[in-house]
């Protein structure tokens, strides 16, 4: 049998294919978005999404063009100028007297009056001019240096913005994981109370306990449910904050379930100790110091002469080179120009003193920043060391609280402990587990702060920039 396809059949077939592949693509996209994201993925998204970084990158690109523009100052300038002039009826009047003056006009030289009578006519003029700097007192050299220093400042500003964003996204990332763990903890705590309420109700039904004991646990059960609701709301808000940083909706964010471990912290800290990165602020201040030094040399160049070559070719009509004939005439010229400063009443000296103060100020800023950064690094090292010790102790407290809860639960079944004892043990366990979560997050956040103060985040930003440019 031979099948015949009409236009409607092709339309239905095409629609089915589009819907099928579209559904698969959408499902694949949702699966990709919903996949747990690592810290590195969140960092990359934040660096690509942040508007402040994009503006700083635009400034850096503009500074690169400034460097290229400064290089052209070494090259000759060629200009063209032209004009059309209509002198009017009274602009040039014919001579009405005899130009042959006795005693003045040389013997044998007679200028007829009709030859020196100039009738009004239009004037056309134009020409090319070339100007080539030869020696400008070092102005062009220093201008190129200043352009490069400005470009360095702009690129380091990009790194500084990126490091700020990285520190922000790190903190938001760990906060989401912290609240995520708090939600799990609240769910576990509520589950423990639910089982305890069920057990006590069974015991109460057998007449082995009082209704008062059941009500005590039910009150705790209600409190645990409220805590769970608050934790879930906090998780949604923390995801919204992280999503605003990385450019995703809160529903699209799913992070790795585990908070950083001691082994991961140790490896990251070891890598940090071996890093030789430098803060962008220090690099920027060094560039600023070099910029002020070049500016001082630029001011001192005002004491030196400027030498330049000039050349050109000009046209004019009427042709002044051939008795003002009504045609186009031209001639070339070449020369050397020299400009020597002589007297400015001390203005240049005062400008040099101002430049000296700017250099001294830049040196002090650099020294002050180096001292402050050294102090910040030491402070953050202490904070991270304290966080690691706190994480160690809270982990031990959590293990002890778990053991205490287990023993108390067994004693309750044997009649050796009361409901009050089991509630206290559960509360102690919940508090110890919550403090353990906070301690691990604090250790991760303080490590991120240490990475920023030591310059490791700037190195990460630099590597990310190189990878983006290679793509």
Predicted regions and their residues:
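Acidic, low-complexity, intrinsically disordered peripheral segments
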Residues: 2-6, 28-32, 79, 86-92, ...
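Small/polar (Gly/Ser/Thr/Ala-rich) solvent-exposed segments
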Residues: 54, 77-92, 115-121, 131-160, ...
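Small/polar, glycine/serine/threonine/aspartate-rich low-complexity segments that form flexible
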Residues: 31-34, 81-129, 256-265, 297, ...
């Amino acid at each position: 049998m031979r099948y015949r396809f009409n236009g409607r059949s092709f339309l239905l077939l095409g629609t089915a294919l589009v819907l099928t592949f579209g559904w698969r693509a959408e499902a694949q996209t949702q699966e990709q978005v919903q996949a747990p994201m690592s810290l590195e993925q969140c960092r990359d998204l934040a660096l690509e999404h942040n508007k402040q970084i994009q503006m700083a990158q635009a400034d850096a690109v503009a500074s690169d063009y400034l460097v290229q523009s400064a290089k052209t100052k070494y090259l000759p300038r060629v200009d063209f100028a032209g004009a059309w002039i209509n002198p009017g009826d009274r602009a040039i009047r014919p001579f009405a007297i005899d130009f042959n003056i006795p005693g003045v006009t040389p013997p044998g030289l007679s200028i007829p009056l009709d030859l020196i009578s100039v009738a009004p006519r239009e004037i056309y003029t134009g020409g090319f001019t070339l100007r080539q700097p030869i020696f400008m007192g070092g102005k062009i050299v220093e201008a190129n240096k200043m352009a490069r220093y400005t470009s360095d400042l702009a690129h380091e500003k990009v790194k500084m913005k990126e490091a700020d964003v990285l520190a922000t996204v790190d903190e938001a990332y760990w906060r989401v994981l912290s609240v995520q763990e708090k939600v799990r903890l609240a769910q576990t705590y509520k589950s423990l109370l639910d089982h305890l309420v069920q057990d006590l109700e069974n015991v109460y039904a057998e007449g082995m306990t009082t209704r008062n004991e059941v009500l005590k646990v039910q009150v705790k059960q209600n409190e645990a449910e409220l805590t769970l609701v608050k934790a879930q709301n906090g998780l949604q808000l923390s995801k919204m904050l992280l999503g605003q940083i990385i450019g995703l909706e809160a529903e699209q964010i799913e992070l790795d379930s585990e908070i950083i471990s001691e082994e991961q912290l140790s490896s990251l800290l070891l890598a940090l100790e071996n890093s030789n990165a430098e803060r962008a602020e220090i690099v920027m201040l060094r560039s600023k110091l070099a910029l002020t030094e070049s500016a001082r040399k630029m001011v001192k160049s005002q004491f030196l002469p400027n030498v330049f070559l000039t050349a050109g070719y000009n046209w004019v009509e009427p042709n002044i080179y051939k008795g003002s004939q009504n045609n186009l005439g031209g001639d070339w010229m070449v020369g050397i120009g020299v400009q020597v400063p002589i007297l400015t009443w001390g203005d240049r000296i005062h400008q040099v003193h101002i430049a000296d103060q700017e250099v001294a100020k830049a040196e002090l800023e650099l020294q002050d920043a180096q001292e402050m950064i050294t102090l910040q690094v030491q402070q953050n090292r202490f904070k991270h060391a304290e966080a690691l010790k706190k994480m160690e102790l809270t982990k031990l407290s959590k293990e002890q609280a778990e053991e205490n809860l287990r023993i108390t639960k067994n004693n309750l079944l044997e009649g050796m402990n009361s409901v009050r004892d089991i509630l206290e043990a559960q509360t102690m366990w919940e508090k110890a587990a919550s403090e353990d979560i906070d301690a691990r997050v604090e250790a991760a956040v303080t490590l991120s702060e240490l990475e920023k103060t030591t310059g490791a985040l700037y190195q990460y930003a630099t590597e990310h920039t190189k990878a983006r440019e290679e793509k």
